[in-house]
Swiss-Prot record:
MF term (GO), any: translation elongation factor activity
Localization per Swiss-Prot or TrEMBL: Cytoplasm
Any one annotated GO CC term: ribonucleoprotein complex
Protein name: Elongation factor 2
SUPFAM superfamilies hit by this protein: EF-G C-terminal domain-like (SSF54980), P-loop containing nucleoside triphosphate hydrolases (SSF52540), Ribosomal protein S5 domain 2-like (SSF54211), Translation proteins (SSF50447)
Family the entry assigns: Belongs to the TRAFAC class translation factor GTPase superfamily. Classic translation factor GTPase family. EF-G/EF-2 subfamily.
CDD domains xrefs: aeEF2_snRNP_like_IV, EF2, EF2_II, EF2_snRNP_III, Elongation_Factor_C
Described purpose of this protein according to its UniProt entry: Catalyzes the GTP-dependent ribosomal translocation step during translation elongation. During this step, the ribosome changes from the pre-translocational (PRE) to the post-translocational (POST) state as the newly formed A-site-bound peptidyl-tRNA and P-site-bound deacylated tRNA move to the P and E sites, respectively. Catalyzes the coordinated movement of the two tRNA molecules, the mRNA and conformational changes in the ribosome.
Gene: fusA
Amino acid sequence: MPRYKTVEQVLSLMKDRTRVRNIGIIAHVDHGKTTTSDTLLAASGIISPKVAGEALALDYLSVEQQRGITVKAANISLYHEAEGKGYVINLIDTPGHVDFSGRVTRSLRVLDGSIVVVDAVEGIMTQTETVLRQSLEERVRPILFINKVDRLVKELKLSPQEMLNRLLDIIRQVNNLIDMYGEPEFKEKWMINPQAGNVIFGSAKDKWGFSLPMAQKKGINMKNVIDAYTASDKSKLEELAAQAPINEALLDAAIKFVPNPIEAQKYRIPKIWKGDLDNELAKAMLNADPNGPIVFMITDMKVDPHAGLVATGRVFSGTLRSGEELWLVNAKTSQRILQVSLYMGPTRELAEEIPAGNIAAVLGLDRARSGETAISVGFSNVQGSFERLHYISEPVVTIAVEPKNPKDLTKMIDALRKLSIEDPNLVVKINEETGEYLLSGMGFLHLEVSLQLLRENYGIDVVTTPPIVVYRESIRAKSQVFEGKSPNKHNKFYLSVEPLNDKTIELISNGTIREDMDSKEMAKILRDEASWDYDEAKRIIAIDENVNVFVDLTSGVQHLREVMDTVLQGFRLAMKEGPLAHEPIRGVKVILHDAVIHEDPAHRGPAQIYPAVRNSIFAGFLTSRPTLLEPIQKLDIRVPADLIGNVTAVITRKRGKILDVSQIANMSRITAEIPVSESYDMASELRGSTGGRAFWGTEFSRWAPVPDSILLDVVTKIRERKGLPKELPKVEDFLS
């Protein structure tokens, strides 16, 4: 099918929202997402059917093709016919490796349905559970595709009955997850049911697949599958692919089970839009109204070497046209659209307009970042934006980088800036003391890929330090009230600190409690769910990005209101670098009990207020059993039953903890936790001790206190690395 014709068809169909489906392909790493996408693209005439499954068209970065994993979420609009009608399917292929799960979270926001790909042999892995949970939290309806069914025949040599049992077991596990994480009103309706047709069995690599209704209609059963793989020649396999093409099975199911934007936005907008649902913007979104005001949710920023920054996202209402002026809610500025296009894999095809319900790529919004909301400029005073995206992981590993050739320094700084625009989970910082450029990522692979992108896209070779694990500082007890004085002695603050309980940390981390919410609503939740005193909770005035809160319990302090912004800035600065090892502070409640403020503004500027606030917080911190928190990783390991002992030995050696061991057929599943600091050579150790027969997944689990037995050693090493004095600060150092 000639490509220009497809683009024309796609553009004309986009206007009929009942014919649009926004779907993503999500899975654990290596379960076959990109191969599945390729097979779908081949059917739409976008890549040659002969190379589908090997072309990895959506893995268009060379780093992806070399490593065989998807790093970026790639978009494409497909044309598909079902029951005589044409449909536009906006397809997003997302990364499965846990280091890139931030990109999955962003792409889910713009989808209405997801194809969950599961390897028939490996079954449900850590990342499958994570992405399915994220999908359900965003009210994205799942369809199941059990891929690599050929492995059950070729590798495990199962009989038809054993194959059926294995497949039913995977379906049961997926339904358990839907039951666990789905919302009450969707659970029943979204359960996976083979009879209904929302589960596909197949092999993306060999291009065949079917649902039960399709198999019954075409007279196919599992015996045909076994015959195709046990036959001496390939003709039976080709016959199977011709009789049950995978693209037909998957796209027909997507059209039948994934709602169109009009249906989906009615129940998804109340979940993801935080703002009044009765205003004109919200009403237009609830109806996916192409004639309403524009609301464009940006999920991805890409640097195009020829065109500059390209913003990709979903049009929830209105119609995007070039020349249109939009207000960027987070950046608080307006910008004009220079060009509107849609993605066909790595290439962008120009479009005159893209209406509500579709995915668009836009030039001109170079001040936007991932997670930005762009709206019609006349609505800039309307309160509301999309709910903050919750990333399952956070950056936990850091390296220092410098260019091999010192002349490349400005080029490297510019390239790092561009990389961090494209990937908000990559944090770039400058160490003020040493002048080093620090790069923090979600894991070792995330940083490796970023360095490879620096080399390939920007031609910069860099020298790096070995990876450093990121820590947090925290406390385990309540402090007394300490007085912090400003350097000129004219301002005094009386503050105390105490640890936040686990429930409060959870409520803030998952976005239930936000700094910008109504104080009464916040106080009610904290009282009912986290045992707070209602009046104290009502007086929370700041929550920072590392889950620390500031409570103002003062009454009638003169001039406090005029300096409160400076006080809060001082609080945020203190939380960025704690006294133990200059690592960020996490999980601390700071209470302001009283203050004395000088009446003359000249004597109460930031240079006076910041140190006074910081000193009393740090004095309290050092008397409250301070500790370091280290990032802990969850491991999900599958291994033949006779090798359990080898795996548990590796985990125990790395300060790990076995959480669960279960048996599935002749494979054992081990769930465990280990500190990220011990995981650097985990892959080679596991491979070595099991002869390469273990496969596993990892994800960020939680922050946990460093054991007391090694605490001082870890703190000393961090202080040495940062060039800080060897001896720890004392309380007296902060009390002048």
